[in-house]
């Protein structure tokens, strides 16, 4: 491979790496799927609690409101990023609280833990079987988008690591 080709390839990889780190990419491949998981969990809780368990019903609506708030933040960050505007808020409500505590990444990690816990609960409790067909397809879409994007980033990072080690070792 000639030097110009190598430089061109590096520029392409740098551009790809920047794309993976952009708020638009992060919002729509992580944030929005997480909002869908929360929303469907909350709706399922309200459905199960309706008329029989007021606490589960109220809890479900709180989760729905949380999901909608997070969705507004993620979509807004994605749009502002595409417009090259400042991003005056975090990806989710919990991280926004973390912003005021000067630890937004810690709170974002807590939100991630809670969301993965929701996914696990939906699976292990078999609540996932209570989703309507359109809700199930929405769940599948969110899962696919989230996992495929994570896999693409992992593959990309391994290629970059391999190239860096190959170049540094000769």
Model regions and ranges:
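Short membrane-interface loop/juxtamembrane segments of multi-pass integral membrane proteins
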Residues: 87-110
């Amino acid at each position: 491979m000639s030097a110009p080709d190598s430089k061109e390839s590096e520029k392409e990889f740098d551009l790809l790496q920047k794309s993976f780190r952009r708020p638009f990419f992060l919002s729509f491949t992580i944030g929005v799927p997480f909002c869908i998981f929360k929303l469907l969990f909350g709706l399922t809780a309200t459905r199960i609690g309706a008329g029989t368990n007021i606490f589960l019903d109220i809890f479900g609506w709180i989760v729905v409101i949380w999901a909608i708030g997070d969705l507004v933040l993620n979509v807004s960050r994605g749009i502002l990023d595409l417009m090259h505007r400042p991003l005056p808020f975090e990806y989710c409500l919990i991280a926004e609280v973390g912003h005021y505590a000067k630890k937004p990444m810690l709170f974002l990690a807590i939100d991630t833990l809670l969301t993965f816990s929701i996914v696990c609960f939906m699976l292990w409790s078999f609540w996932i079987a209570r989703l309507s067909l359109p809700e199930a397809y929405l769940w599948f879409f969110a899962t696919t988008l989230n996992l495929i994007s994570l896999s693409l980033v992992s593959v990309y990072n391994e290629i970059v690591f391999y190239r860096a080690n190959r170049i540094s070792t000769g």
